[in-house]
């Protein structure tokens, strides 16, 4: 009936705590095309006059750049065709600075009462991320991480980070700077996200040919080919908003 309208529901009601009733980007949650280009920070923080989060998601606007040069020349009967294609791809969006952290976490070299009183193994560097038994009220360190390399509480390298999770009661818990904010679902975009780093690919192409008889020629070529990333590499802010409910 006409008396019902989707605008009766706030964005968070339509997102339904992670069991989303709508899917959108480039439009607002009620299906109206956006006239602005909201940032990722806007998605997590921007509110309307009634205090409802707008949850606006910008359209996906990757930047593709490509160039090609080619030259053909001959040396006696040997004909060369040489070229170079350069492709540059910029997803033009934010990505996590550390793919394992949605909230800022302490590293070994930072000074807190908890870390100052901790017994840190000699194999652990100052830049290693600290994992604890309880993110809200840590009492013991259960592991460390250096990029993709994980260590247990004794500083021994481990191949399975689930061992760190088991030591924390079944869930990996980094030593968070703001555990209260993380528990409330706050995401500090400026602290944990960064701009996507554009990728540049160089693709040489070399071909040559020469006659091997009056009626036949020999041809050979070498080239490097790449494929542009698919649309599926678009960042999905809703996934991060409800990550705790979806894992």
Please identify what each model-predicted range represents.
Residues 2-12, 16-17, 30, 58-247:
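Structural signature of Gram-negative outer-membrane beta-barrels, strongest in the C-terminal barrel
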Residues 40-55, 182-190:
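Short glycine/proline-rich turn/loop motifs
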């Amino acid at each position: 009936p006409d008396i019902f309208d989707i605008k009766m529901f706030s964005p968070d009601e339509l997102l339904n705590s992670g069991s989303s009733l709508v899917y959108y980007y480039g439009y607002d949650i009620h299906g109206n095309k956006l006239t602005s280009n909201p940032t990722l920070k806007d998605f997590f923080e921007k509110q309307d006059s009634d205090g409802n989060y707008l949850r606006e998601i910008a359209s996906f606007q990757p930047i593709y750049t490509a160039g090609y040069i080619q030259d053909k020349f001959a040396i006696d009967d040997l004909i060369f065709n040489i070229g170079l294609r350069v492709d540059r791809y910029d997803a033009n969006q934010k990505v996590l600075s550390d793919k394992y952290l949605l909230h800022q976490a302490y590293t070994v070299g930072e000074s807190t009462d908890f870390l100052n009183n901790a017994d840190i193994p000699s194999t652990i560097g100052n830049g290693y991320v600290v994992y604890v038994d309880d993110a809200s009220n840590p009492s013991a360190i259960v592991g460390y991480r250096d990029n993709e390399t994980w260590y247990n509480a004794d500083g021994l390298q481990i191949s399975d980070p689930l061992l760190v999770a088991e030591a924390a009661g079944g869930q990996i818990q980094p030593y968070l700077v703001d555990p209260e904010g993380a528990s409330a679902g706050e995401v500090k975009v400026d602290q944990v996200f960064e701009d996507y780093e554009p990728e540049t690919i160089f693709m040489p192409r070399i071909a040559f040919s020469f006659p091997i008889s009056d009626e036949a020629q020999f041809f050979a070529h070498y080239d490097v080919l790449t494929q542009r990333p698919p649309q599926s590499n678009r960042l999905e802010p809703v996934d991060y908003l409800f990550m705790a409910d979806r894992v």
